[in-house]
Curated annotation (Swiss-Prot):
Gene from which the chain derives: quuD
Miscellaneous comment: Encoded by the cryptic lambdoid prophage DLP12.
Keywords: DNA-binding, Transcription, Transcription antitermination, Transcription regulation
Name of the protein: Prophage antitermination protein Q homolog QuuD
Signal sequence segment: none
Organism encoding this protein: Escherichia coli (strain K12)
One GO term (biological process): single-species biofilm formation
Amino acid sequence: MRDIQMVLERWGAWAANNHEDVTWSSIAAGFKGLITSKVKSRPQCCDDDAMIICGCMARLKKNNSDLHDLLVDYYVVGMTFMSLAGKHCCSDGYIGKRLQKAEGIIEGMLMALDIRLEMDIVVNNSN
């Protein structure tokens, strides 16, 4: 079973480094210059894996844009729980629960697609 947080961390690093290639004009325009070098220096996934996850993210945006934006803020932009809590006027605990829900939805989509990712070798849990 894959560690969805590791998957999304690698996808987030890929998206941060390739934001001009990602066709999220509303996001890219709003966050231009806000992506820190800390986020950019993380390990990335390959383009093929990123496109699969981008497809899942597009579906999430269509059905629940709040959860999509939360994942982008956390994994691409690199916002902390506290900064997300301030942005959404709620507690950091609530942000954690919302992130878990969003991560679970993406994980479920990847399971339903039954596609092997190249990064599975690195991100699989050995439980």
